[in-house]
Swiss-Prot record:
This is Elongation factor G. Residues 8-282 form the tr-type G domain. PANTHER family: RIBOSOME-RELEASING FACTOR 2, MITOCHONDRIAL, TRANSLATION ELONGATION FACTOR G-RELATED. Belongs to the TRAFAC class translation factor GTPase superfamily. Classic translation factor GTPase family. EF-G/EF-2 subfamily. Signal peptide: none annotated. It is found in: Cytoplasm. NCBIfam families: EF-G (TIGR00484), PRK12740.1-3 (NF009379), PRK12740.1-5 (NF009381), small_GTP (TIGR00231). GTP binds at residues 17-24, 81-85, 135-138.
């Protein structure tokens, strides 16, 4: 089958936002107007097309990023609906990695909210062009220009309206297009009857003022346009559109639109903007990767004629077809039934069937082309972030960075029958979600699961019960502490055992130095002259990694440390890999005496919104929880407090805030960084873990 839509007419976009900004409803409306669904499902009724997991429909939030494809004005638009809750940031990150553009949905009453900042920052890291949709213009307190100001103040974004709303709240009745200088007036509830007319007289001055501001902002990114503007020449609609498109694709400018997805207003104009201003796969730089055979960097331009290269960005277990691997094709074409090479794992995989997904229904297709997003059935070894390529043209594409989990729970099966099922269930859930880890406590034999927050683990335990029919008892949440060294030191690890027969001999000198935060463990072999034979060096590294997993103070993993093996000795007969592994672990123990080890705790960026009269209570809460205030701002009758607070102090805070503010206060928290715990707290943690507390 030939390609249905050219690359120029393909858009891969994500829809991202803070929880409750109306993102899923916006996606629903897109599917409605592009003819993918015939009846609109409301998120708050639990009937939305994109939210297809039972927990999503119950909770009214999007947990997994469903991928769907739609058509608008002879373009194919592949949409990924991403979750807005902070516990599911990996879903957002995975999606951004494979998208070409995004629509950021704001609640027009609140403007930029904490999770908007998080997803915006992630999109900036990946260089994703964005348009902004100020949604919920029908809501009480909706203020379009306030929303635009929060983009400047909180995100320092060069964002400007390309539209203005006509009215707000119950009087929101249309939209002014600042590019065409026409008004769209909505005359029915479904937003299908639209009158295009001249701008109402009482809005004309404002429209002229904001068109001028728009031209000025865009001209700063385009020299030719700037010259015309400075010389007082008329800027045509075509020129302005082209300049907005170019500046948006270069991530120098962010167009802002207005609408109400729930009231069916502004969604079609937003779809027009997706087609007009967001990039096609041809507008973005070719994907880069490394050839595993030569270690040389290679590029894969978006073209069907190039060798096949794709990135797997999500694994999902489907109740009907089993394991689904979602992938983005960067170059080449792929037919069902063919073989590909998973270059990340060095394994050959057969593509069984290829499915084009629509929320949770599917259409089988024979071929996928460059720029497409699809799901494959039959891949056994592939996990999130793996590269799939033509066997004759290998390349490893840049993978997806996975954040470390910050919270853990103990789970135990209720019966022997549940025990076997629980192992399988946890393994499948961990395959789908790289931020979900499953470990067994070596000393107690307990199963410990870790993730990005309480809601994240709640949802996974819930899925274990529903999808895999596993009944389990769940312990109280625990903080995932870490350990690190604060001072450079050198230490010797010497292991010798000779008691008849073959002995054991390993001797190493290792220099340990603190590493930058987030860099993890780095090992360097600086042995000269073979004093530690080359074949034993990997055993030294392995010995360090294994013993660092259990720390030196309270059994938490040691992170952000460099280890340099620089001296040692060996025995011709008695030296072995095991002996050098043990010697390395002894060196680590020895180093702990002088390296000033400390315990690190996850610090959360907490954003608390309360009525003015509760501000004093909140400041007290932050101080009592070892937190520090980072900033405050007034918003209407509310105060917004931003603070860094240790995760350990935040359990149960929702109840405290609810009673202090009579249920009117809300808070959001997102992991920010790790920090040394105070000495007194460190001693308590060590005692508790030693079983003394």
């Amino acid at each position: 089958m030939a390609r249905e839509f050219s690359l120029e007419k393909t858009r891969n976009i994500g829809i991202m936002a803070h929880v409750d900004a109306g993102k899923t409803t916006t996606t629903e409306r897109i599917l409605y107007y592009t003819g993918k669904i015939h009846k609109i499902g409301e998120t708050h009724e639990g009937a939305s097309q994109m939210d297809w997991m039972e927990q999503e429909q119950e909770r009214g939030i999007t947990i997994t990023s469903a991928a769907t494809t739609a058509q608008w004005k002879d373009h194919r638009v592949n949409i990924i609906d991403t979750p807005g809750h902070v516990d599911f940031t990996i879903e957002v990150q995975r999606s951004l990695r494979v998208l070409d553009g995004a629509v950021t949905v704001l609640d027009a009453q609140s403007g930029v909210e904490p999770q908007t900042e998080t997803v915006w920052r992630q999109a900036t890291e990946y260089g994703v062009p964005r348009i902004v949709f100020a949604n919920k213009m029908d809501k009480i307190g909706a203020d379009f220009l306030y929303s635009v100001s929060t983009l400047h103040d909180r995100l320092q974004a060069n964002a400007h309206p390309i539209q203005l709303p006509i009215g707000a709240e119950d009087d929101f009745e249309g939209i002014i297009d600042l590019v065409t200088m026409k008004a769209e007036i909505y005359t029915n509830d479904l937003g299908t009857d639209i009158l295009i007319e001249d701008i109402p007289a009482d809005y004309l001055d404002q429209a002229k003022e904001y068109r001028e501001k728009l031209i000025e902002a865009v001209a700063e990114t385009d020299e030719d346009l700037m010259m015309k503007y400075l010389e007082g020449e008329e800027i045509t609609e075509t020129e302005l559109k082209a300049a907005i498109r170019k500046a948006t694709i270069n991530v120098e400018f962010f167009p802002v639109l207005a609408g109400s997805a729930f009231k069916n207003k502004g969604v079609q104009m937003m779809l027009d903007a997706v087609v007009d201003y967001l990039p096609s796969p041809l507008d973005i730089p070719p994907i880069k990767g490394v050839n595993p055979d030569t270690d040389e960097e290679e590029e894969r331009p978006a073209s069907d004629d190039e060798p096949f290269a794709a990135l797997a960005f999500k694994i999902m277990t489907d109740p009907f077809v089993g394991r689904l691997t979602f992938f983005r094709v960067y170059s080449g074409i792929l037919n069902s039934g063919s073989y590909v090479l998973n270059t990340s794992k060095g394994k050959r995989e057969r593509i069984g069937r290829i499915l084009q997904m629509h929320a949770n229904s599917r259409q089988e297709i024979e071929t996928v082309y460059a720029g497409d997003i699809a799901a494959a059935v039959g891949l056994k070894e592939t996990t999130t972030g793996d590269s799939l390529t033509d066997e004759k043209a290998k390349v490893i594409l840049e993978s997806i960075e996975v954040p470390e989990p910050v919270i853990q729970l103990m789970v135990e099966p209720k019966s022997k029958a549940d025990q076997d099922k629980m192992g399988i269930a946890l393994q499948k859930l961990a395959e789908e979600d790289p931020t979900f880890r499953v470990e067994t406590n070596v000393e107690t034999g307990e199963t410990v699961i870790s993730g990005m927050g309480e809601l994240h683990l709640d949802v996974l335990v819930d899925r274990m019960k529903r999808e895999f029919k596993v009944e389990a008892n769940v312990g109280a949440p625990q903080v995932s502490y870490r350990e690190t060294f604060r001072q450079a030191t050198q230490a010797r690890g010497f292991f010798k055992r000779q008691s008849g027969g073959k002995g054991q001999f390993g001797d190493v000198w290792i220099e340990f130095t603190p590493n930058e935060e987030g860099k993890g463990f780095e090992f360097e072999n600086a042995i000269v002259g073979g004093v530690v034979p080359r074949e034993f060096v990997p055993a030294v590294e392995k010995g360090l990694i294994e013993s660092m997993a259990n720390g030196v103070l309270a059994g938490y993993p040691i992170v952000d440390v460099k280890a340099k093996l620089y001296d040692g000795s060996y025995h011709d007969v008695d030296s072995s890999e095991t002996a050098f592994k043990i010697a390395a672990s002894l060196a680590l123990k020895e180093a702990a005496k002088t390296a000033k080890p400390v315990i690190l705790e996850p610090m959360m960026l907490v954003t608390i919104t309360v009525p003015e009269e509760n501000l004093g209570d909140v400041m007290g809460h932050v101080t009592a929880r070892r937190g520090r205030v980072d900033g405050m701002e007034a918003h209407g009758n509310s105060q917004i407090v931003r603070a860094f607070v240790p995760l350990a102090e935040m359990f149960g805070y929702a109840t405290v805030l609810r009673s202090a503010s009579q249920g009117r206060g809300t808070f959001m928290m997102v992991f920010d960084h790790y920090e040394d715990v105070p000495k007194s707290v460190q001693e308590e943690i060590i005692k508790k873990n030693a079983g003394e507390a």
